[in-house]
Amino acid sequence: MTANGLAQPTPAVRAKGPPVWLDMDQKELDDAYDQFVYAPNARQVIARCHRNSELVRERLGAPKRLAYGPTPIEALDIYSAKTENAPINIFVHGGAWRAEVAAGNASQAEMLVNAGAHLVVLDFNNVIETGGDLMTMANQIQRGVVWVYKNAKSFGGDPERIYISGHSSGGHWVGVLLTTDWQKDFGVPPTMIKGGVAGSGMFDLKPVRLSARSNYIKFTNEAEETLSAQRHLDKLVAPVAVVYGTAETPEFQRQSRDFAAAVQTAGRPASLSVMEGYNHFEVWEQLANPYSVFGRAVLNQMKLRPT
């Protein structure tokens, strides 16, 4: 009842449409691939992550900025360990494939540097800049990783201890990198990457292609097939750690669970860690915390301890 005694109007109930993916209709699927629907504090957490990256640079100093390719965006930031021949963690940022840059994704640098590792954060074109083409992005990221392997010694890194991590669409790229045929496509050892941590990623692009994300991504059969890591587990040779939060969208939770299970079924080493009560963006923020599930997964895989 309202203050004047009149009955409140009953909210209209949305009629459910035909199923598009599993039991979800189009709106439900679109929402399941829109993290902002499930994270009301998203913009605040994103702002904190960006600010924390700035604070880390104030404490550690500016990273080395080196080019891995011919275009201005094809560069990477190196936050250097204090010891020579140190292990390397390459981070691939998220942003729904269309946002974010390396500078705003360095809050975990202090954790890794203090633990004795280099952090390398890749920059690359977003999907808007590539005209909707994910394959171009994939090639840039792959070339960035190859550059790190070939040039590791030049910045005091150990090319035999390269690990990767990523969150959101960066978690998707971790899956792609772990299932790349490095010998065939780039002429480098298939065991170049020693392990990967995929936070809140996507590993089968079919439902993503059916969602509203296809409004800005030009999904092709080639892109869907090539960039769906779960379909290429025969190429997976490194351990993978999968992390997600229970307050993420149902599809992001399912994607992580299904990928970890598929890797284990294929006889490859995989772990699944669940962050109870964390939404998508809060999972990202916790990467900088060495005692969080996400931060610990990265350190443990590299056999490092927080300091």
Show the residue positions of the predicted features.
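Alpha/beta-hydrolase superfamily serine-hydrolase fold, recognizing
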Residues: T2-T307
